[in-house]
Amino acid sequence: MSESQASAQENLYFDVVIVGAGSGGVAVSSSLLKRNGNLRIALVDPATKHYYQPGWTMVGGGVFSAKSTERKTHTLLDKRVSQIHQLVSKVEPDANSVSLQDGSVVSYDQLVMSPGLTLNWSAIEGLEETLGKNGVTSNYRYDLAPYTWELVQKTKHGKAIFTQPPMPIKCAGAPQKALYLSADHWLKNQCLDNIDIEFCNAGGVLFGVPAYVSGLQSYMDKYGVSLSYNHNLIKIDGETKKAWFNLTDAEGNKSEICKDFDMLHVCPVQQPPSFISESGLSDQAGWLSVDPFSLQHTQYENIWGLGDVMNTTNAKTMAAVRKQVPVVAKNIISARAGEAPSAKYDGYGSCPLTVERGKIILAEFCYGGRVAPSFPNWLNVGTKPTKLAWWLKSVALPFVYWNMMLKGRELMTNCPEEKA
């Protein structure tokens, strides 16, 4: 179809329907066509623009321009993929169909659910009204990451608060990445001593994989950061520059405290799209219920999960998606051939923690928090800050994303297969 687009004004049938044009959706469409070029594939998403979201941390740190993280969606899709510019209202798994918001229906043989998660900005009272002004920002939005960098450059003294909500969130390290790059700038511009930095984390640990905590803690100490655990942001008054937190003490008692700020970087509350549970596809928490290894739905054998929407315990990162894509693609090809899924995802995720401009602690791990480095120690020690990891984040990974991953060129993505 022209310009990789399709009209959904009538009932349509495809071999594979993919919900979501994010990293997973675009990449798996390409990977499937690499394996079977005759597949009829539809990608359901109204988005005309696609973003390299891992780059927004670098935008907020003054390393990337926002524009460099953006492409037009249709330019990334294989011409054999039909994009349907509609939102999903509900999946009818027993009918093998997807109902769209314009009332039309798309039928499928295999369905890939990769709609991502929902950023609930309204969950924090007063946040929406003050975002992008009054010193309140977030690297979790394309249009706000440049404001983060603007604030970092303008802030010479005062109070800077960085927040992290309850898990799960996209890239659990992102809230502290913003902190590190900001603090590094202030240190190098001789104003860090005049800025009181506080990291307010709704959780109880600095990072979920113990092997990396020591290295990260050393940077928190270097920058003089006050670590406030079990502090959950609930309300903001941008005009008076006050933020309220729910604090849970060691005995489980809750109290509310107010903090003044000059700069506030907020990580929003994150949740699954509502249509997942409304379609009967979710677990009790609302996330897509899948087998953690095959990524096949726990009830419907022709439905597959990919990316942030799943209830798997891996880190919700682009690196995880890069490893998940070939698993889903291989297993769909097997399913269409009447075979059981054999490709397995091991829970791999990666979080390049930008502890300073020019150095990164490259956290890589699988299910259970098992450290899973991609490189030998003589080349890169993942638990320590290295220049190589910075080069990967700032140069190599964006290139791999745009020119390989989204095009179905699978680099370092070998997935184990179950032996017969």
Region spans (language model):
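FAD-binding core/adjacent interface of flavoenzyme oxidoreductases
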Residues: S2-F14, V81-Q190, E251-K254, H265
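Beta1-alpha1 glycine-rich phosphate/pyrophosphate-binding loop at the start
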Residues: S2-S82, P166-P210, C415
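A conserved FAD-binding loop/helix module that cradles the flavin
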Residues: L306-V355, E364
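C-terminal auxiliary extensions adjacent to catalytic cores
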Residues: L12, L362-A420
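FAD-binding beta-loop-beta segment adjacent to the flavin cofactor pocket
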Residues: G286-W304, V355-F375
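A Rossmann-like FAD-binding core segment of flavoenzymes
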Residues: N38, V81-V91, A95-V98, V106, ...
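FAD-site-proximal beta/loop scaffold in flavoenzymes
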Residues: S4, N120, E128-K156, D260-K323
